[in-house]
Amino acid sequence: MPPPAHRRRRTAVTVATAAALALGAGALTLPGPGDGATATAAPVSSASSDAPSGARLAERLDRGVVSVGGPDGNLVTWRLLGGDDPATAFNVYRDGELLTPEPLTGATNHLDPDAPADASYTVAAVVGGQEQPPSAPSLTFADGSLDVPLDRPEGGSVNGSAYTYDANDASVGDLDGDGRYEIVLKWDPTNARDNSQSGHTGPVLVDAYTLDGTRLWRIDLGANIRAGAHYTQFQVYDYDGDGSAEVAMKTADGTRDGEGTVIGDAGADHRNSGGYVLSGPEYLTVFEGATGRALDTADYAPGRGNVADWGDGYGNRVDRFLAGTAYLDGENPSMVFSRGYYTRAVIAAWDFRDGELTRRWVFDSDDPGNGAYAGQGFHSLSVADADGDGRDEVMFGAAAVDDDGTGLWVTGHGHGDALHVGDFVPDRPGLEVYGVGENTASPDAWLADAATGDVLWTLGSGNDNGRGVAGDVWAGSPGAEFWSSSVSGLRGADGDEVGPKPGSANFLVWWDGDASRELLDGTRIDEYDPDGSTRLLDGEGVASNNGTKATPALSGDILGDWREEVVWRTADNTALRIYSTPHETDLRVPTLVHDTQYRVALAWQNTAYNQPPHPSFALGDTAAEGAGAPWPDIRHP
């Protein structure tokens, strides 16, 4: 049976249609906020049903207006919201002066030539010929970037090992319900360790900042949470539907919340002589986004049990954690935390409702009938409505777990690093999963049907293939392209070689004005071309994270129009520097964060070996066909 199409409850709206309807009465109105618009939603319920009956809960965001200075003037960009009337047009104002003789009905950007770099802009939606209240003033990227000042923690020493702090992975969420994103940032001590390495580490700290650099709170995870890429995976999302995001992560005895309250036993130290934490209680805590206050704490599932049951006896594989956010009931977000992937793998899903954590289900590869799922996890995970039933699945490397916590499929290709899930082959129904493997007895790279796990093609064998990317980086080949470290060439949707391999296999970013994605690696952005890539951005005074992984603190559509921002730490760790595109576009696309597959990808991006986000639709091919992006079906708190 062919897999079902996945574009459920979405409406494609062309730019031409939007332009035709923008100024007339009787335009189709979808519930949504916008600036000056209203929307309501039923409160979150934990009740389940056979099929989702309503729209997905999504953030009520403002326009996110930015002004990016460049040699040709200021590029003003803003969000087209998923709750907007698709025909919404916009007026643009500079310091209160109207710049647009007629409301703009196309892409949500406007170039203001020869304007002062510090000019302030607002935009006002026009719906049915009526101008709505103006947006909040623009954020100014005078030289192409915006610095968010940081309060760098003091370093210290532990067991003879001195350390300072580097700003590491980040996430975003509307922590206070004002429609604007705040940043949640993890600070790693410089003596952080891979699980395979012994040694004591300094404590992991987690901060929250407004975009003007105001620190809202600091959480100290304490001595019993080791520092390293595989230990702390934090999720930032509005789980209870109150309009403000929560922050969830693994905690332990001695964790101190944002108000100074200690979780568990403040004096306990469970570290052994090698710095590993292989005894003592383990917790999952949900913190209030606005204050960092611990709202509820539960025992982490699963517990470590017998350390050797996870693949070794010294503490490496037992502490391999992943985390994500998924709409398991099709309407409301749940959190997912896991343990293990080399051998035993356990995934626990949780709801946070009415101030309490409730375990939704646990999937354990040790349970009867689940043995094939052992050893299939990657150093990352993804979340998508893989089978088209309106509810999300957990894409766990070379396997998938259904929304109800039962196994959906397993390829048997084993453990790997990079995992990508999206609509990579638009001429076939549904989503695809691209993986690259470390298992030398399995294919180096493979593409599978996300609904069934049926493998569409494989490439190479016998190698530990550490890097791989899937994305539409070249318009000369239909659908996405695929490449990886140990496989030659750039591969097309059918696996055949279509061009030379790009110079990096890391992150992706929509940066210039077309629908193809650019290459993001280290502190630079390049545009792929078979005849040679073109450098579009060199980040100045910034540094990437996670050693040779060379990842940004965060990358995604967090401000302005649908193009993606890149957030790097400054080299001296005094600020996060946000870059936003200076390039115009003629593509009208709703903000990607109102596509829930993309939005939850921003939530899990910080997990272990960070990977770029993918939406649920093929942006490049819909643009090439002259169609607008599919319109989200969402509701707001």
Feature map (PLM): residue ranges:
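Short beta-strand elements bearing conserved aromatic residues within extracellular beta-rich modules
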Residues: 89-92, 576
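An N-terminal, helix-rich hydrophobic module
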Residues: 74-77, 91
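Secretory targeting and sorting signals
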Residues: 1-41
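Small/flexible residues
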Residues: 9-12, 65, 96
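Beta-propeller-forming repeat regions
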Residues: 44-64, 73, 80-85, 97, ...
